[in-house]
Amino acid sequence: LTMDRQMLTKIISGILKNAIENTPDEGMIQMEAETLGDNIQITIRDYGVGITETNRELIFGGFFHTQDTDMYSSKRPYQFNAGGAGADLLRIKVFSERMDFSVRFETTRCPYIPTDTDMCPGRISDCKFIQNREGCLTTGGSTFYLDFPQV
């Protein structure tokens, strides 16, 4: 993989930041890199709330918020439900178009909070719908795939 280190850091940290801000406390995020044919694939999987069907086509559009900004609980970066300007995923999409790599995602919205106005309590142990951590880890989340050509 030949790419400017700062750019690669911005790409990965942008997806990680979104994963952290959408995964309740006591949750889990996984990241792995592997060679797949002629590509290097970086996968970032969060076990968070997932993205609603309505928002799936909009998240790379730029300055898009998945909920009303008044509903953000902390407004502090890297905390659950912090919210943001919606610039990270736009930046990653622009980088992908200019630097010849692909970005895609799969997501499952937590069935207990199906709309953007339904709120996750922010801590798995505070959720009234599940019995334990594993119950949360199997209900929702998103996986982002970054595919970089090897040179």
Question: Which residue stretches match the model-derived regions?
Answer:
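Acidic ATP/Mg2+-coordinating residue in the GHKL
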Residues: 46
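Glycine-rich phosphate-binding loop
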Residues: 72-94
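Short helix-loop "hinge" at the ATP-lid/N-box region of the Bergerat-fold HATPase_c
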Residues: 18-20
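Conserved glycine-/histidine-rich ATP-lid loop and adjacent helix of the Bergerat-fold HATPase_c
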Residues: 91-104
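Short conserved segment of the HATPase_c
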Residues: 51-76
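Short beta-strand/loop element within the Bergerat-fold HATPase_c
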Residues: 26-38
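Conserved micro-motifs of the catalytic ATP-binding
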Residues: 3
